[in-house]
Structures are given as structure tokens and as C-alpha cells.
Swiss-Prot record:
Molecular function GO terms recorded: DNA-binding transcription factor activity; transcription cis-regulatory region binding; zinc ion binding
Note: Seeds over-expressing ZFP3 are insensitive to inhibition of germination by abscisic acid (ABA). Plants over-expressing ZFP3 are dwarf, have reduced number and size of siliques, which contains few seeds or are empty.
Alphabetized UniProt keyword annotations: Abscisic acid signaling pathway, Metal-binding, Nucleus, Zinc, Zinc-finger
UniProt name for this protein: Zinc finger protein 3
Keyword Nucleotide-binding applies: no
PANTHER family: C2H2 AND C2HC ZINC FINGERS SUPERFAMILY PROTEIN, GENOME ASSEMBLY, CHROMOSOME: A02
Function: Acts as a negative regulator of abscisic acid (ABA) signaling during germination and early seedling development. Involved in the regulation of vegetative development and fertility. Modulates red light signaling in seedling photomorphogenesis.
Subcellular location: Nucleus
Organism: Arabidopsis thaliana
Disordered, as annotated region: 186-206
Induction: Down-regulated by abscisic acid (ABA).
Keyword Nucleus on entry: yes
CC terms in the record's Gene Ontology section: nucleus
């Protein structure tokens, strides 16, 4: 039996060589398949990297106003809302500036300086009625007629805006004008006379010294006129 097997194996030696060649071919095919798998794996990794880069490039969002880039649409939306708030504030400031330049200062003048000035007069010992009822005259051409200061109420007692002054104040001013009428007429008559054409007021405020063609003329003092005015007002 064993002798027959040996004889058969020796009788077909070419069959063994054929089997060996087939095994070698199968081994080569298997090795080549492994090499192809490695190449495919490298290609897969490169494709994955390329896809990741393209995905990151697609996720970048840029702002149209300042060209800043953001990685999410939510961040870009908040940034654009901040730009909108800035624009609305800028427009509001421009409208306020335009209205202020067109209509002037909306609050007008403050009454505090006038009130403080009135208090300063009180601190210096000057009374309000002596200021309001004081009668003044100025030097120069036309000063011969005198100038009447209307009596002015203190700042705290002035009527509010939109209210007319009372009739008592109107009668008081009218009475004051009627009492001053004779003195004004007498001064106008003295001016018309040719002897008093070149008079100049000089000296102290209580003594008026007039120079004319006929010599020195002394007029009544300012103090006496003030006393007459006070007496007339008391009546």
C-alpha cells in the first residue's frame, strides 16, 4: 500500500510542482490585496481631512459692516443687533441736535441768577422799594426832560407768565406820570429860552451847576425831588 503511494507520487512529479505554483499565486494575490487596502485607507483619511476643512470653511460667518468672522450664525446675529442699536442711537442724537439748532435751547434762561442778584441787594442793605421807585436822569442832549423809571416789583412778587398785571399797578404808574408832568414841562420851557442853550451838568449828584450866558444857575437838588416824589406817592 505504501509502496503504491510512493510509486504514484514519483510517477506524477509535475503535479506537485503545479500545486506549488498555485499556492504561490494565491499568496501573491493575498499580499497584493493587503497593499491595495492600505492605499484605500490613505485615500479615505485624506478625503476625511478635506471634508473637515470644507465644513469648517462653510461655518465661518462674516459681518457686512466690520468684516469680522464668526463661527456660528447666533454669534453673528447678536453682533448685527449691536450694530443696529448703535445706528439707532446715532440717528436719535442727530435728530436732537437738529431740533435744538432749529428751535434754540428748550429750557430758556434760568431765573436763578436774577433771584440771587435780588438777594445780593438785600445783603448790601439796599431795599427793594428804594430801587424800584428811584428816579434817574442822564446827562446829555435830551437829559433835560429827565427819564422816568417805572416801578418794578421784586422778582419774587412778579406775576407769572400769561397773567396781566393788576389794575392797581396801572393806576399807580399813571399817578406817577401825572405827578411828574409839571417838572417835565418846566424843564422843557427852560430849554426853549435862549439863555439856557449851553448848559452842562457838572458837580455832585445832589447839586446841579448850570453854566449859561447870564452866569451860574442853581437848580433843585435830586434829593429834594426824591422827597417830593415820596410825598406824592404816599398821598
Amino acid at each position: 500500500m505504501d509502496a503504491s503511494i510512493v510509486s504514484s507520487s514519483t510517477a506524477f512529479p509535475y503535479q506537485d510542482s503545479l500545486n506549488q505554483s498555485i499556492e504561490d499565486e494565491e499568496r501573491d494575490v493575498h499580499n497584493s490585496s493587503h497593499e491595495l487596502n492600505l492605499i484605500d485607507c490613505i485615500d479615505d483619511t485624506t478625503s476625511i481631512v478635506n471634508e473637515s476643512t470644507t465644513s469648517t470653511e462653510q461655518k465661518l460667518f462674516s459681518c457686512n459692516y466690520c468684516q469680522r468672522t464668526f463661527y456660528s450664525s447666533q454669534a453673528l446675529g447678536g453682533h448685527q443687533n449691536a450694530h443696529k442699536r448703535e445706528r439707532t442711537l446715532a440717528k436719535r442724537g442727530q435728530r436732537m441736535a437738529a431740533s435744538a439748532s432749529a428751535f434754540g435751547h428748550p429750557y430758556g434762561f434760568s431765573p436763578l441768577p436774577f433771584h440771587g442778584q435780588y438777594n445780593n441787594h438785600r445783603s448790601l442793605g439796599i431795599q427793594a422799594h428804594s430801587i424800584s421807585h428811584k428816579l434817574s436822569s442822564y446827562n446829555g442832549f435830551g437829559g433835560h426832560y429827565g427819564q422816568i423809571n417805572w416801578s418794578r416789583l421784586p422778582f419774587d412778587q412778579q406775576p407769572a407768565i400769561g397773567k396781566f398785571p393788576s389794575m392797581d399797578n396801572f393806576h399807580h404808574h399813571h399817578h406817577q406820570m401825572m405827578m411828574m408832568a409839571p417838572s417835565v414841562n418846566s424843564r422843557s420851557n427852560n430849554i426853549d429860552s435862549p439863555s439856557n442853550t449851553g448848559r452842562v451838568l457838572e458837580g455832585s449828584p445832589t447839586l446841579e451847576q448850570w453854566h449859561g450866558d447870564k452866569g451860574l444857575l442853581l437848580s433843585t437838588s435830586h434829593h429834594e425831588e426824591q422827597q417830593k416824589l415820596d410825598l406824592s406817592l404816599k398821598l
